[in-house]
Amino acid sequence: MKKAKKRLQGFFYHLFIIAFGFLMLYPILWMVSSSFKDNLEIFGTASLIPKNFKFDNYINGWKGVGGVPFVVFFRNSFYYTILATIGTVFSSALVAYGFARNKFFGRKFWFVCMLLTMMLPYQVVMIPQFIIFFKLGWVNSFKPLIIPMFAGQPFFIFLMMQFIRGLPIELDESAKIDGCNRFQIFTRVIFPLITPVLITSTIFQFYWKWDDFIGPLLFLNSPKLYTVSLALRMFSDPMTSTDWGAIFAMGTLSLLPILLVFLIFQKHLVEGISTTGLKG
């Protein structure tokens, strides 16, 4: 009787998980399916299986919009995302090491200030940032999107701090005895040991920057500089008929880099989050 009850509970549990997972995946499945349909079929039926597979959507979408091929938008997104991710991860690790290992005047004060910046919505600092970067002549370039990332990001600094605090201080002392200065201790001892949290931060930042819309919208004016997220918005023109099939086709392609990064580093992502929680 108990075994039958457990089996029944297990059945309903897995049924719920499958149903919930399908609901979560349905928008993505619908987008992929719609990338093979024409406009009439996209909005005329809710079926996930196209009646006639239309591969022209990918061809038309890849031609781009506004005279700019879509490969340019992908190149811009990779350029922005990769540089911003590298700058964020390395600078955040450096700042996290400073907070976790070095004692200096006002450390707690600056740490609290850093945490407070995490609570500010981006809309609060959006206009001041634009004014500053406009006066610097950085608008309509990738500078305001990339250069600030080399100053560290509070979320990743806090995440890495928890990991570094779990490392034995004796490692630093041994390296210091061997003649290493603080920067050498960081690059040769600490940095290699925090690989799990570095990979976790890389995945998160890559995902956030690849999907970033408001930043490029605010600072990029030339279509030749547009990222994928902005380019997808350009496809929708209220003055003319919108090729929704091409939009969904390019939207499907834009998911591939994120999906590949997640699949490749999935093991490290889980490890980085779990070990950071334990060490914190």
Language model segments and positions:
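A structural signal for multi-pass alpha-helical bundles of membrane permease subunits
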Residues: 2-280
